[in-house]
Every structure is written in structure tokens, then in C-alpha cells.
Amino acid sequence: MTLAFGEWIIHRRWYAGRTRELASAQPAAVTALGDGLDHVLLDVAYTDGFTERYQILVQWESAPVDRYGEAALIGTSSGPDGTRFAYDALFNPEAASRLLRLINSSETVGELTFSREPDVTLPVDAPAKVSGAEQSNTSVIFGKDAMLKVFRRVTPGINPDIELNRVLARAGNPRVATLLGSFETSSCALGMVTAFAANSAEGWDMATASVHDLFANEVGGDFADESRRLGEAVASVHATLAGALGTSVAEFPIDTVLDRLRVATQAAPELAPYAPRIEERFRRLAERPIQVHRVHGDLHLGQVLRTPESWLLIDFEGEPGQPLEDRRRPDSPLRDVAGVLRSFEYAAYQQVVTGGGDAQMAERARSWVDRNVDAFCAGYAAVAGEDPRASGDVLAAYELDKAVYEAAYEARFRPSWLPIPMRSIQRLVS
């Protein structure tokens, strides 16, 4: 296969190598799936010696196909039969449906194993449409019934998104979209199918709409009831994971958070005046035993969906960019709680920062955050039996760790938003 994958992949939203210089992009394995559809595992190497593997499905056509879209065109290949056009096959509804049929019939093709979960039905005849919502993966929606998520960057080992969704589904927890199937090689997971949450709304969109209403009207939109229900949902998922996979005791991850603080302070010099106090807060917890179990790992308002019936937690892959073994390591459920609390602050203050808000707007944003934090924690406590704020110093440390990460990110990519985590850091260390 002689396609210039490197020229195409660097422009994809899911490409993770933007901070590195690409050296090569070569197919490591190609599996023909029929009807001009090839499955490609692409090895990408960088000039600093780092390597990673991506998954691409290639649809070959004898002529340009405008309906796939310009971004789907990978390149062309010339041979005895003339020029062929290579497209990202997930933009071809027929190719996406071919994948779903392979999963439905639990077939094996070459090194690829497709598996349907027991006692489920896949909508193999439903129309397929690629979703534009995701960044690190690509999803295809089949009617109103199922969603196929194709992992773009693939890593050897057990994928936590499939693993935890399977555990939760088999335990009967209703707070996740039911796992319907998956596909993999002998060494790594490649994709999964879940029930599609039709007529759902993302938590981030709902929260920011509430804040917008608050700033536009004296009464404002109240999100507190939804926050309470979300707290109940998160606690329910935590309880199921703890019951199904067990709990243990570990020390607070002092080395990890201190390493992150050092790296973040280099990226965001604004952190330097606060670094000693942040480090002091972390060191207070050194050797502190905490209860841990498997958790979501990267929970925020963009990872939850509100259906007409309830809240659902999605995307259990863990924190992007972290090694797979770290993403599968048991952690305190307070990490997930801290992620939601940080997300409340972002929902409220991003409109203050981007809209040039005054002190009154900031005060109202703080009031909105406090009200929703109270509601979320009350909902969590109603299921878990204890308010997460009862472990206030540990929860604050996880919030600080998250805010430190956010400060580094904003300093690199979105400097105008840096005041959001800096405001929180100042509050948490005061």
C-alpha cells in the first residue's frame, strides 16, 4: 500500500502527534474486508524516536466520491487498472454497515476478531451516519439504536472503555449505554458498539445553557436538580464497579501529582507563586491510605448524557494521553467527583472570561457553582451513604491536581481561559 498516509493523518482531529515532528507513517498490517474495504494498522514514527499505532479503514473507489467529503480523501494510487481513490471508509455508510454486520455475526477475518455480546440485537439494516462530535475517536450512528466507536490510536492491552462498559452492562447498571459488541486483534481493542442514546443532551451543553440563562435574567436557569440526579448516577456507577471488581487501599499518588505540578509550572509560569502551597497540600497526604477501585478516570460534564429517563456516563477510556496501565489502575472515586466539580467551574466561569464579565457576573457564577456542587454532592451521598466532601482534604487535592493540569493546557492552547483554573487554584490553596 503506497498511500501518503502521513500527509493526511496530520490534519485529522484525532491525531495525537501535533507536538512532535512526523518521521514516517507506514502500514504495519492490512486486512481485506471485502467490497474494496481494507483495515489498516498504521505505525507512526517521530523524529524524537517515539512511535504509536493508528487504525484506519480505507475504502477504495475507481472515481472520486463527493458525498464522502473532501476531508475523507486519503490519497490516490496508480496501477495497471488505472488510478484508484482511497477514502476514510467510516464516511461511507455501506462500509460502516459492513463492520456492523461482521460484529453481528461474530466473524473472524485474518487477525481481526468481531464479537457480538450475548443476547443482544444489532440494527444491521439501520442507516449509518458518521458523527462529527468526537476528537480522539470516530463514531458512526446507526439509526436511533446503536453507535459504533472506532478507536483511532490503538494500544496493546485491555481497553478500559470496553472492559468497564461490559462489567456495568452485565451487572445491570442502567447508568451506561449497553455494550452490544466489539472488535479487536489478539493484542489490542479496535472498536465497540453500544446502544445509542437517542434524544439525549450533553451535560456540558445543559450546564452552560443554564449559566447563560442566569446571566441573561435575574432568576436564571436552575441546573441544581439535574446536578443532584447526576450525583446519584455517578455514585451508582462507582458502587457497581466497586462491587464487581473489588476495592483496595492505596497511598495517595503523591509522586504522580508532584511530577504533574513540576511539568505544569514550566508550561504555565503563572503557577509558580502558588506551587509551594500546592506542594504543601499534596505532601500533607503523603502515605495517607485511601480506598480505591476502578473509576471512570476522566469524568466531566462532556462525558455525561441526559436522556429522557436518566443520566448516562460515557467514554470510560480514562485520561487522554496517559499510558494504558495507568488508565486501568484503581483510583479514588474522589477523582471522578473532582472532575465534575471542576467542570461546574468551567461551565460557569468560561462565560465570564470570554464575555468580559464584571464582578457581578463573577459573583453570580460563584453562586451557580456552589449551588450545583451542593446538589451534586447531596445526590452522590444519597446513594453512596457519605458526602464526598467528608474527605475534604483529599477531594481538594484531586481538584488541585486537575486544576494544575488545566492550567498547563490553557497556557499552551487557550491562554484566554487560563484565569479559570488559576482562580480555582487561588481559592483551593487559600
Curated annotation (Swiss-Prot):
The keyword Transmembrane does not apply. GO terms for molecular function: ATP binding; kinase activity. GO terms for biological process: carbohydrate phosphorylation; glycogen biosynthetic process; trehalose biosynthetic process. It comes from the Bacteria. Its EC number is 2.7.1.175. Pathway: Glycan biosynthesis; glycogen biosynthesis. Pfam families: Mak_N_cap (PF18085). Keywords: ATP-binding, Carbohydrate metabolism, Glycogen biosynthesis, Glycogen metabolism, Kinase, Nucleotide-binding, Transferase. The keyword Cell membrane does not apply. It catalyses: D-maltose + ATP = alpha-maltose 1-phosphate + ADP + H(+). Belongs to the aminoglycoside phosphotransferase family. Catalyzes the ATP-dependent phosphorylation of maltose to maltose 1-phosphate. Is involved in a branched alpha-glucan biosynthetic pathway from trehalose, together with TreS, GlgE and GlgB. Monomer. This is Maltokinase. It comes from Mycolicibacterium gilvum (strain PYR-GCK).
